Amino acid sequence: MDTPFIITLDGPAGVGKSTLAKRLADRFEIAYLDTGAMFRGTAWKLGEGAWDWDADKLDQALKGLEFTLSGSGSNSTLSLNGTHLTDEIRTETVGMWASNMAKIPAVREYQKIAQRAIGETTSLIAEGRDMGTVIFPQAPCKFFLDADLEERAHRRFEQLKDMGKPADMAELIEQIAARDDQDRNRKVAPLKPAEDSIIVDTTHLDINGVFDKLVFETEKKVN
């Protein structure tokens, strides 16, 4: 494809975005861009409290960050300053740090520029919270996934268990609810579907059913 083909996949935590985005990337042989990992990586790299830094200090720190995306499908690799981002950014604590960072206009502007730069040269599926509304508004194929809070917490619990990490269901529900509130009510790029997004409630759907629907809708755009 001469012009990069972009698929956007937005939604709150725990709706299955990562799993589905990787499968779609494999299916269509394009790169997988986890923009949530970019926010998490930024928060992890700068550390706790970076959201309270003065504008000049934060600006200088952001200028020192460089994200690169290599590979395709589920083998896509996102790196920050040459370091592959892995499990160290996947804790709930770093997730809350990332949400705090995401409220800062300068951080969102930096991320927007970095993400668009990747999309200018690479066909990809971009997973995040404002991909269809802000980052890639002209993308031909946009999806917004949602699910009940309890179901999302259960999925996160199982994910953490598979990673060998301790988790408490009540605590996860509280953390995800707080994250939802931050994401949906922030002044800059709040979490919401684009007007032309295809909205899919995954609460009572298995992953294969959702995947088949996304493939069907994407193939209509590709063809």
From Swiss-Prot:
Its EC number is 2.7.4.25. Pfam families: Cytidylate_kin (PF02224). ATP binds at G11, P12, A13, G14, V15, G16, K17, S18, T19. It catalyses: CMP + ATP = CDP + ADP; dCMP + ATP = dCDP + ADP. InterPro entries: Cytidylate_kin, Cytidylate_kinase_dom, P-loop_NTPase. It is found in: Cytoplasm. Keywords: ATP-binding, Cytoplasm, Kinase, Nucleotide-binding, Transferase. It comes from the Bacteria. SUPFAM superfamilies: P-loop containing nucleoside triphosphate hydrolases. GO terms for molecular function: ATP binding; CMP kinase activity; dCMP kinase activity. Signal peptide: none annotated. GO terms for cellular component: cytoplasm. Gene3D superfamilies: P-loop containing nucleotide triphosphate hydrolases (3.40.50.300). One of its GO terms (biological process) is pyrimidine nucleotide metabolic process. CDD domains: CMPK. Belongs to the cytidylate kinase family. Type 1 subfamily. This is Cytidylate kinase. The gene is cmk.
